[in-house]
Structure formats: structure tokens, C-alpha cells
From Swiss-Prot:
Cellular component GO terms, alphabetical: cytoplasm
Stored Pfam families: EFP, EFP_N, Elong-fact-P_C
Biological source species: Elusimicrobium minutum (strain Pei191)
Pathway field: Protein biosynthesis; polypeptide chain elongation
Any GO BP: peptide biosynthetic process
Family (UniProt): Belongs to the elongation factor P family.
Protein name (record): Elongation factor P
Length: 186
């Protein structure tokens, strides 16, 4: 059993609803007359969706034993995404609906991690930062490099994000897959 004092980013545990979750971010809060609470941003493994919640310091949770294996995304066909285990070279097909948030960033030959619980593939974890190409955006105007204004741009995977005005069509950008945000030009 683990408690909120054991919390750290990347810790995987079973929450009060029986869901297996990973800690993305956490903060301990204490107000003068109130009890302390721990605010946590969690990623639900299996669906990839995020949820924010609070726990009391005395709350206990069941720790989950997870094995991480290196994977490579190969291709999507129909409603399945195909990955290859880089150690055994076995191919695994994962339903696209199980990759709810991850599929927005999948490009061929992308390195990722397969999470195994009880020797069964439970989730695919993408790298935090990925390099993607801008498919379309309105052109920038000379002198826009000083401003911090943004414009919308569509990536090669179809995702629309906000980028600085100096980014043009065909540029490669680094994206943060956790927050779906632009980081920098590649």
C-alpha cells in the first residue's frame, strides 16, 4: 500500500474507483485552519484521458507492478494500430479507441513504451516531446518574430495547435504530448 507521501511523478497505482492511473503532477496544499490535501493530476492508463482530484494525507492506495518494454509504432489499418516490440520483434495490434489521446501524435517508426501489467499489454506511452511537421497554417509576416502572438496550425497528424507567428508551412516543431502544446522549432 502507498500513501500520498509516496506520490511522485510517474508513479502508477490503483485509485479508489479501481482504475489504474499514473501521476502527471501533484502538489501538497495546507491552509491555516483546514486539513492538508494533495492535489493530483492523473492520467488514466488504458484510455489516456486526464483527471484532476484531491486526496487526504491518510488515504492509501494499491501499488501496481508495471513492466515497461520498448515499442515502435508501425502503421494503422482499419480500427487497429500496429506496434512492434523492439526486444522480441513481436507485432501487437491495439484498438485505436484504446489510444484515445495518443493517436493524435502517432507517426510511423515512432519510439514509444508499452506498459505491461500481469504480462498483458495495458497501455502505450508516447515520448513527452515529439517532432512533427506543420501541414498548413497562414503565412507569417516579416517582423512577427518579436511578438508572442500565436496562430493556429495543422500538424501532419491532423491535430490543430497554437504556434508562434514565425512558424510556416513545412516547418518541423517539437510538441509536448502531455498538454498538446508547441515547445519550440525543431
Amino acid at each position: 500500500m502507498i500513501s500520498t507521501t509516496d506520490f511522485k511523478e510517474g508513479l502508477i497505482f490503483e485509485n479508489e474507483n479501481g482504475e489504474i492511473v499514473e501521476i502527471v503532477d501533484y502538489q501538497h496544499h495546507r491552509k491555516s485552519q483546514a486539513r492538508a490535501v494533495v492535489r493530483v493530476k492523473l492520467r488514466k492508463l488504458g484510455s489516456g484521458s486526464y483527471v484532476e482530484t484531491s486526496y487526504r494525507p491518510e488515504d492509501k492506495f494499491k501499488e501496481v507492478s508495471v513492466e515497461k518494454r520498448p515499442f515502435m509504432y508501425l502503421y494503422s489499418e482499419g480500427d487497429m494500430a500496429h506496434f512492434m516490440n523492439n526486444e522480441s520483434y513481436d507485432q501487437v495490434a491495439v484498438p485505436l479507441d484504446k489510444l484515445e489521446n495518443q493517436r493524435k501524435y502517432l507517426i510511423e517508426n515512432m519510439e514509444c513504451t508499452g506498459l505491461y501489467i500481469n504480462d498483458q499489454l495495458f497501455d502505450i506511452v508516447l515520448p513527452i516531446k515529439v517532432v512533427l511537421t506543420i501541414k498548413s497554417t497562414v503565412p507569417g509576416v516579416k517582423g512577427d518574430t518579436v511578438s508572442n502572438l500565436t496562430k493556429e496550425a495543422e500538424l501532419e497528424t491532423g491535430v490543430t495547435i497554437k504556434v508562434p507567428l514565425f512558424i510556416n508551412e513545412g516547418d518541423k516543431v517539437i510538441m509536448d504530448t502531455r498538454y498538446c502544446t508547441y515547445v519550440e522549432r525543431a
